[in-house]
Amino acid sequence: DMLVVSSPIQEALRRAGIESVCDQALALLVEPETIEEAYRMETVAGPQCMVTPVADFTPARLVAVGAEGKGEALAEAALAVMAEFKPQHTLVEIAPCGLPLDPDSKASLVENRDQYARAAQLFCDCTFDAFFLNGFTTADDLKCALMGLRKVTDAPIIASVDVQGDGGLASGRGTWREAVEVMAEYGAAVAGFSTLATPDQARGLADAARET
């Protein structure tokens, strides 16, 4: 069966004057009713899967949005604001940590992997249905994320990368096929992509994933 995932609520938040990811994190902590109103508009469409309003749960991202040391509070608030709407499925979105990554350096790989492990640990005692790794643009970063999550959790993982119409990743480094291979090898339950390609190109990308 096809499941509909909620759309990002950032546009609704912008209309409410909440522009940046820093403002979104702050609003979630101190003004959750604003986030709830954005979700209320989204639930009119009836999505079965609702996604956390923020995705900045790695230590590096928490620092970037001005929420250093507030990871647990942010995680609890993100799930609490969605619980009111009783979604069929709850997805915890985790965005790329943004740290430099040298795929030839073990220290760099471990540092990045542990970013995602620490993000996943925030949800170890929480109730949700799956992690949603979203917005990734390199297979190496995605690999670190999958390894980090698998280090601390056996929860299902949905993974998505940004892809160009020709099958190259949005960063210009690596391909969609390579990303799918990483997803399969490191335990993603669902492989997905986001693209600005034409419908025919998107269909070709989906076919390529099935063939990989």
Question: Where do the language-model regions lie?
Answer:
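Domain-level signal for soluble alpha/beta catalytic cores
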Residues: D1-T212
